[in-house]
A protein has these predicted regions:
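N-proximal low-complexity "stem/linker" segments adjacent to membrane-targeting elements
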Residues: 1-28
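Short beta-strand/loop segment that forms part of the nucleotide-sugar
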Residues: 34-44, 65-66
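Acceptor/aglycone-binding surface of glycosyltransferases and processive sugar-polymer synthases
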Residues: 65-83, 88, 100-185, 211-221
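Acidic helix N-cap motif at the loop->helix transition within catalytic regions
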Residues: 17-21, 46-54
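Active-site acidic short loop of glycosyltransferases
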Residues: 3-4, 59, 84-87
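Hydrophobic helical membrane-anchoring modules
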Residues: 1-5, 148, 155-156, 179-266
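A conserved acidic beta->alpha catalytic loop
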Residues: 41-50, 96
Length: 267
């Protein structure tokens, strides 16, 4: 296959049921566009990699990076972008919550602006939205609050710095890739923070859809990793997310132990 004009990187973990659906949707959306799809799977126990391999047998556009002993969405995205053959790389989740049709709008913006570095799919622009059942109301409000905090602390100029849906010029990404954290889930916020004001950004609003199959990867650990990223960025990357998480867990353990000891002494 000739050099593609677009690479799509899709990190996966336990998304076997969604592979056929996202492949079909991308095939329909990107018809007539020379593209490749790079799945980066963190050794999913549900057989996601095996499902992807079935499609590889009959489709030269599909590639798989099967990671063993390495975990984390950020690291998966970084590896996928490094492996991409195209100059433009789209990043999206496999859970079908991102609107693949917006990839065409992103491509159009790049074609009109050769100096453009990044296009972000945003849930929070005037024409962006979150489906009623995609988030609980509490999570939606929490997401908006965290977004405001992240933008303020890290001085990020984007309506949705926590988006997992974006398209980037590979050359622009590689300029700061050595300084990006492989731990965690919010690679875009890390990239925006490390790039500062040196990149040209545009946004495309989209509707964040409901997850149909599989389970959300959002957890308390995800939130801890996000705040660890913020602390790491404040410290200019001198301390890794992994070490900050270790400290947070360690301190919480000490706090619990002191609390229990205090209660025992009181009672």
């Amino acid at each position: 296959m000739n050099k593609p004009s677009l690479s799509i990187v899709i990190p996966t973990y336990n998304e076997r049921e969604n592979i056929s659906k996202i492949v079909a949707r991308l095939k329909k959306t990107l018809k007539g566009i020379n593209h490749e799809i790079i799945f980066v799977d963190d050794n999913s126990p549900d057989g996601t990699s095996d499902e992807i391999k079935l499609f590889i047998e009959n489709n030269s556009r599909i590639n798989l990076i099967h990671r063993i002993g390495r975990r984390g969405l950020s690291g998966a995205v970084i590896e996928g972008i490094y492996a991409a053959k195209a100059d433009l790389v789209g990043v999206m989740d496999c859970d079908l919550q991102h609107d693949e049709s917006k990839l065409l709008d992103m491509l159009d913006l790049f074609s009109k602006s050769p100096s453009l570095d990044l296009v972000i799919g945003s849930r929070f622009t005037a024409d962006g939205e979150i489906s009623d059942k995609a988030f609980s109301k509490v999570r939606e409000i929490g997401s908006k609050i965290i977004t405001v905090i992240i933008k303020k602390i890290l001085s990020i100029n984007s309506t949705d710095p926590l988006s997992g849906f974006f398209m980037v010029r590979k050359e622009s990404f590689l300029k700061c890739s050595d300084n990006l954290q492989t731990q965690g889930f919010k690679i875009l916020a890390d990239f925006l923070s490390m790039s500062g004001k040196n990149i040209k950004i545009k946004e495309v609003g989209y509707k964040f859809k409901n997850r149909i199959m599989g389970e959300s990867k959002m957890s308390f650990l995800t939130i801890l990793e996000l705040f660890s990223l913020v602390i790491s960025q404040i410290l200019k990357g001198r301390v890794s997310i992994r070490f900050i998480l270790f400290c947070i867990v360690g301190l919480s353990g000490i706090f619990v132990q002191l609390l229990v000891t205090g209660l025992v002494l009181i009672l």
